[in-house]
From Swiss-Prot:
Compositional bias annotation for Low complexity: 51-72
Topology in the lipid bilayer: Single-pass membrane protein
Free-text disruption phenotype from the record: Homozygous VPS35L knockout is embryonic lethal at an early stage of embryo development, between 7.5 and 10.5 dpc.
Name recorded for this polypeptide: VPS35 endosomal protein-sorting factor-like
PANTHER family: ESOPHAGEAL CANCER ASSOCIATED PROTEIN (PTHR13673), VPS35 ENDOSOMAL PROTEIN-SORTING FACTOR-LIKE (PTHR13673:SF0)
Cell compartment(s), UniProt: Membrane; Endosome
Transmembrane domains' residue ranges: 699-719
Protein species of origin: Mus musculus (Mouse)
Protein family according to the UniProt entry: Belongs to the VPS35L family.
Length: 963
């Protein structure tokens, strides 16, 4: 292609901006205004009634100010219309009977505020373990007596049931001895699976025998420490059995017409299902031993619903009385717990049986301290302090069921009954664990009095105070009692010798102290914790509790100047010697600071403490630290840096940033934040001085610029460095630091050749050229206003950048290099104008320095021609079949650039634009709609002043035809 000279058209930016503005239309009073409320006039005309229709509407017209969206509605919404046409009686007031029914329904269900058994189950299995050997009787699965044909007479049925059950007791079992706890759990799981397999294979009697065998295990207390966990495992099997029986009978009620409703009555149950249900109860009634008979019947308690409405209410008191026959108090209390669990599930409204279980338990409570139990403990070598906590899960569950939504009078009566019993620490602990926190909190002094009267040998008082503290963390005691409560509790806690017992109690009472007292009391508590946990490095075994204490303190002290003035707070942090735990605690503190600190701070107490905490987080970073962890730490440190402000003391602010840079040099996001903060500091200085720097402020902003120039090279991300060089150069330019700005821009230009072909973004490799193109376009916008250095040639920065672009290795399939050259052409065209589009205050750009000098314009034109030659040469290389689409798009893009920036009165440039137009359409690759819109734009512009030559150009631009 021939060489074409470049001629930039003269631009009048103010006139162009004015021509682009929307036409202003004066508004008279009352005329339309976009912010004025919409006034809708609604007209209703009489409808023409159709054949068979008697409806009509009256004519009316109304005008009102309404929501514009409501204008689409022509009347009442469909749901309101439906409600209006419903039976008036249905919308009447609620009758007394319906109100009673509603109250009854509320008591018929257990709400989400009731802690389910599943939560306690996991805790029990984890807590009650043993290393002693266990034994189990394993069912061998004899098939003798399998129920086949039905007996004709009732006596035959009874005999058959007894024979089936006796078969189990006559040798169909094998005793396994010396099992570990895990082996025992595995065997129980085998029994559970055998139960399911037997049921699936229709061996119902075998399934019942397995359940009976498992229930018998609950009478064995030979390894007493494991009993609570054994109870959990075996009642899981009982629950499975109860569910299978219920589902079996329920399925018998389903016929081809309908299924059994959720809230069915016995009248909905057919005779076959009732007969089967009775058969199960008769089989269970034939079990000779009390404990298995009780547990198996309790497991299918829900099946009473198939027989009668009052079946459950009649059965629960009988089962409650059956438990009186169990002699061992531990076995007895867990039987009551199971009955309460089943009862609260199937009939939560039947409170009487729950209450009776509780009061029956109180009557037998003294058995715990009787000779029989004492002899058993001696035989097994178990201390009373280890034995009594075995009751806690069962008692806690009974108390929870009884106290759930219980009236105040009942709770008071229960408390008084417990108070009358001697050695009642175990009861007291269960009361405080199960009763509502508000009930316990309002009677805190009463409970403290009861705790004092308890015998220390039976149940540790510190556990009672811990239970009390848990309640006071949820509800507030009377204000006048608060200090006395703390003093009474802490007297006991601080005397504890065991560090583990001490920290378990102290952790709970820290919450109470923070809620109701000042930093003085909190400081005293923290000092006491340090005193108890430092000897023999006891804190190493209690990191979770110590972390919990820190979290509770910072949750209540949102004013960090107060928090860090607590003398023992930082020494408390020193107990976290393990690095991972220490870092987690520091992160917790920083998260609280970022969340709750509302105003920037310069408080030296806060700054010194948080710098120490941030330094701890930073120093934990090593080569093995995950990127996510680094991002989290950097985010927290950056949040702190943003909240530090020394007001107008800019020098102190810069000193803080210098110190921060030295402390946090291993986290790149923190260094980036510091650079942005220092640049912002320089711009704030400029704002204060209104652009007129004094000698002092000029030196200060140069110091800021130097800070950035020194820090940027230490960063790893190449585009981070490029963008920061550009941003910092712009800040330097705005503060009249011209030589420093040149240094930033030269550094950016020198960095471009180092840009790799691909970069990693979110763990995936991406081509870097789009990012480089974006950066260079931003760079060109800045270069427009950068004045030339007097000791260098004309447009020396542009020349250096062009050389770098030329030498950079671009992808063969990419046109980004030409897009960059096109942007350079736009830049050079803007530089040739008499007055530039924008300026920086108090910085003379090249339009002022050269004042339209012919030598400057000649150099500019030479660069333009060189760039044009590169563009045209690239277009020439795209004349291949696979690249014709790219050639068409680039040709049209270059045409638009000439149209926007070139002087088309020049014949050669005019001819070049025509050639590009033809090139874009030559191979049918151009988008016809785009070409039509472009031509329409040219014709529209030709009507503007001094644009007549575009009319002739439009005539020379044909549109391709589709043939």
């Amino acid at each position: 292609m021939a060489v074409f000279p470049w001629h930039s058209r003269n631009r009048n930016y103010k006139a162009e901006l004015a021509s682009c503005r929307l036409e202003t239309v004066p508004l008279e009073c009352g005329d339309y205004h976009p912010l004025k409320p919409i006034t809708v006039t609604e007209s209703k005309t009489k409808k023409v009634s159709r054949k068979g229709s008697t409806s009509s509407t009256s004519s009316s017209s109304s005008s009102s100010v309404i929501d514009p969206l409501s204008s689409v509605l022509d009347g009442t919404d469909p749901l309101s219309m439906f409600a209006a046409t419903s039976d008036p009686a249905a919308t009447g007031t609620v009758t007394d009977s319906s109100r009673k029914k509603r109250d009854k329904d509320e008591n018929s269900f257990v709400g989400p505020d009731f802690e389910p058994w599943a939560n306690k189950r996991v805790e029990i299995l984890a807590r009650y373990t043993t290393t002693e050997k266990l034994s189990i009787n394993l069912f061998m699965g004899s098939e003798k007596g399998r129920g086949g044909a039905a007996a004709s007479a009732m006596s035959e049925k009874v005999r058959t049931r007894l024979e089936e059950l006796d078969d189990f007791e006559e040798g169909s079992q094998k005793e396994l001895l010396n099992l570990t706890q895990q082996d025992y759990v595995n065997r129980i799981e085998e029994l559970n699976q055998s139960l399911k397999d037997a049921w699936a294979s229709d061996q119902k009697v075998k399934a019942l025998k397995i359940v009976i065998q498992c229930s018998k295990l609950l009478s064995d207390t030979s390894v007493i420490q494991f009993y609570p966990s054994k109870f959990v495992l075996i009642t899981d099997i009982l629950d499975t059995f109860g569910k299978l029986v219920y589902e079996r009978i329920s399925s018998m009620c389903v016929d081809s017409r309908s299924a059994l409703p959720d809230h069915f009555s016995p009248e909905n149950v057919n005779d076959t299902a009732k007969e089967t249900c009775l058969n199960w109860f008769f089989k269970i009634a034939s079990i000779r031993e009390l404990i298995p008979r009780f547990y198996v019947e309790a497991s299918i308690l829900k099946c009473n619903k198939f027989l009668s409405k009052t079946g459950i209410s009649e059965c629960l008191p009988r089962l409650t009385c059956m438990i009186r026959g169990i002699g061992d108090p531990l076995v007895s209390v867990y039987a009551r717990a199971y009955l309460c669990r089943v009862g609260i599930e199937v009939a939560p409204h039947l409170k009487e049986s729950l209450n009776k279980n509780f009061f029956d338990f109180l009557l037998t409570f003294k058995q715990i301290h009787g000779d029989t139990v004492q002899n058993q403990l001696v035989a097994q070598g178990v201390e009373l302090l280890s034995y009594l906590p075995l009751y806690s899960p069962a008692m806690g569950w009974i108390f929870q069921c009884v106290s759930y939504h219980a009236p105040e009078a009942l709770l008071t009566e229960m408390m008084e009954r417990c108070k009358k019993l001697g050695n009642n620490a175990l009861l007291l602990n269960s009361v405080m664990s199960a009763f509502r926190a508000e009930f316990v909190a309002t009677r805190s002094m009463d409970f403290i009095g009861m705790i004092k009267e308890c015998d220390e040998s039976g149940f540790p008082k510190h556990l009672l105070f811990r239970s009390l503290g848990l309640n006071l963390a949820l509800a507030d005691p009377p204000e006048n009692d608060r200090l006395q409560i703390l003093n009474e509790a802490w007297k006991v806690i601080t005397k504890l010798k065991s560090p583990q017992d001490y920290i378990n109690c102290a952790e709970v009472w820290v919450e109470y102290t923070c809620r109701h007292f000042t930093k003085r009391e909190v400081n005293t508590v923290l000092a006491d914790v340090i005193k108890h946990m430092t000897p023999d490095r006891a804190f190493e075994d209690s990191y979770p509790q110590l972390q919990s204490i820190i979290q509770k303190v910072i949750a209540h002290f949102h004013d960090f100047s107060v928090l860090f003035s607590v003398e023992k707070f930082l020494p408390f942090l020193d107990m976290f010697q393990k690095e991972s735990v220490r870092v987690e605690v520091c992160k917790c503190i920083m998260e609280a600071f970022i969340k709750h600190q509302q105003e920037p701070t310069k408080d030296p107490v806060i700054l010194n403490a948080l710098l120490h905490i941030c330094k701890t987080m930073h120093d934990s970073v090593n080569a093995l630290t995950l990127e996510d962890e680094k991002r989290t730490l950097a985010h927290l440190i950056n949040g702190f840096i943003k909240m530090v402000s020394f007001g107008r003391d800019f020098e102190q602010q810069l000193s803080f940033y210098v110190e921060s840079r030295s402390m946090f040099c291993n986290l790149e996001p923190v260094l980036v934040q510091l650079i942005h903060s220092v640049n912002r500091l320089a711009m704030e200085t400029r704002k204060v001085m209104k652009g007129n720097h004094s000698r002092k402020t000029a030196a200060f902003v140069r110091a800021c610029v130097a800070y950035c120039f020194i820090t940027i090279p230490s960063l790893v991300g190449i585009f981070t460095r490029l963008n920061l060089y550009l941003h910092s150069g712009q800040v330097a330019l705005a503060n009249q630091c011209l030589s420093q700005a040149d240094a930033f821009f030269k550094a950016a230009i020198g960095l471009v050749p180092e840009v790799p072909k691909t970069i990693s973004i979110d763990g995936k490799l991406r081509p870097s050229e789009p990012f480089l193109l974006e950066f260079l376009c931003n760079f060109f916008s800045t270069l427009l206003i950068v004045p030339d250095h007097p000791e260098h040639g004309v447009l020396f920065l542009v020349r250096e950048l062009l050389n770098v672009i030329q030498d950079y290795t671009w992808e063969d399939s990419s046109d980004d290099k030409i897009r960059i050259y096109t942007s350079v052409l736009h830049l050079l065209s803007a530089m040739s104008q008499d007055t530039y589009l924008y300026h920086i205050d108090k910085v003379d750009s090249n339009d002022s320095l050269y004042g339209g000098d012919s030598k400057f314009l000649a150099e500019n034109s030479k660069l333009c021609e060189a760039v044009m030659a590169q563009i045209l040469e690239h277009l020439k290389t795209l004349a291949k079949d696979e690249a014709l689409k790219r050639q068409s798009l680039l040709g049209l893009s270059f045409f638009n650039s000439i149209l926007a920036h070139g002087d088309l009165r020049n014949n050669k440039l005019n001819q070049l634009s025509v050639n590009l137009w033809h090139l874009a359409q030559r191979h049918g690759c151009a988008d016809t709609r785009t070409m039509v819109k472009t031509l329409d734009y040219i014709k529209k512009r030709s009507k503007q002043p001094d644009m007549n030559h575009l009319s002739e150009l439009a005539l020379r631009l044909p549109l391709q035809t589709r043939t």
